[in-house]
Amino acid sequence: MAHTGIRSSPTRRLATAGLALLVLTIGSGRKPAVAASHREAPRISLDPPADITDFFLFRSYEPGREDKVILIMNVFPGGEPSSGPNYFTFDPNVLYAFHIDNDRNGKAEDVSFEFRFRTEIRGLVDQFNLFVSYVGCGVRTPPCATPLPPITSLDGPGSEGLGLRQRYSVTMVRRGQRLKLAEGLIAVPSNVGPSTTPSYDTLAAQGVYPLPNDIRVFAGQRGDPFYIDLGATFDTLNFRRNPPLLTPAEDSNDDVNPFGIDTIGSSNVQTIALEVPASLLTVDHKSPSETGQPKLGAYASTSRRKVTVLTAPTRSGEGDEDEDEVSKSAGPWVQIQRLANPLVNEAIIGTDDKDRWNATEPEEERQFLDYYLNPRLALALQLVFGVPAATSGRQDLVDLLLKYEPGDKRLSELLRVDLRTPPTPLAAQRRMTVLATPPDPAGWPNGRRPRDDVTDIAVRVVGGPNYVGARAGDGVNKNFRPLTVTFPFLATPQVGRDRVHQNPPAGP
């Protein structure tokens, strides 16, 4: 099909001008993207524990810790909170990793952090060979006939009911030199319910560990921070207002959903969060205000060994960090998913190439250049709504998503952050970041925070000036659950016992 987009030079100039502010953010402390990455490719949709739903990179906005850089990876999309008896865990056969480019050569191999998990069956579940992973008699009426201690601790007294427990290690790799920062850390379990996990926030706080070099880490369940009217979006852009345009008042109100439904707001995810001093990541080991290279590029990845052999299950606890109880893996690690800017693979890369894209390195992005120059999302918007979109010749998207500066020759799909931009406190953050009035330069595409509305930003930026000016969006302006101002920043996961299969109503 021939592209039917606007082709005249004046319109092309309008499209470029409409994105000029975002292009400038790469150099001044901002930048764009598209959305999230839930089940975005055929192969990874069959592998939930390795499926990265979101990747966040930003300067910490926790008071007193603004000199830190935050990296967050979420996996396991669509986590149903009540999904017992095993709930959700990380996969011991997956290598989870963050990769950082600090010298702007487009190769995110300067600093990396790797995470490996192992699973053990223990406590009351092992003692009585119970059919559930977690057990406890906390807040309930009437009380249990036999007093079983609820899960109030990750280890020691109060952890007896934590039957399925995961420990993990953290390794930092700097230019090929490996340093194990920690091992034997405990991942926070799922939020089962008031009887089993009665003081969940207190339990989760125990999962924040201090590491050497003033690093902090968290692994465990959190509420899914991504917000979108998912059902309406994938019903061929069948939004709940036609055309899907926000009024100026609606667009400036980040606390009300004008007409959309946060479809995945009550789902949970498995989170790996890392807080690192900026000086540990910069090429010259200096702070954000002192470094001569303030721009970082990064992405998250999941990998599996090249060969996996299924084996007969062993007795619980006999596995090690390289294998779980039912499989053995060998050979080199093979990348099976990557994520930097949100929704690139979901809304830009064509279905035929999605699996191949996930397996390639970010610096190999030139082979996918046509998808950026001729975005299919823009074409879809034009076909559905009949409003001209910028469907071809989109060098502006190439500059935004694949470069540190528009003049760069190297193309690399990384999420980039300018450390010179001061973080915006959570209460003052604007979901539309640089498209807001007034602009908030500390959000996507200058890194990405959980609050940033990458769906609406993507629709407008990819659609072009007509969609920017008309304030197009999905009608969801906020997450179903409130974010926190402290590390690891994501909301308390939805409690399993109280999960109701009813989405919050559409906005007024």
Each predicted region: which residue ranges?
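N-terminal secretory signal peptides that target proteins for export/translocation
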Residues: 1-11
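Sec-dependent N-terminal signal peptides
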Residues: 9-21
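C-terminal segment of classical bacterial N-terminal signal peptides
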Residues: 23-32
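Surface-exposed extracytoplasmic segments
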Residues: 32-508
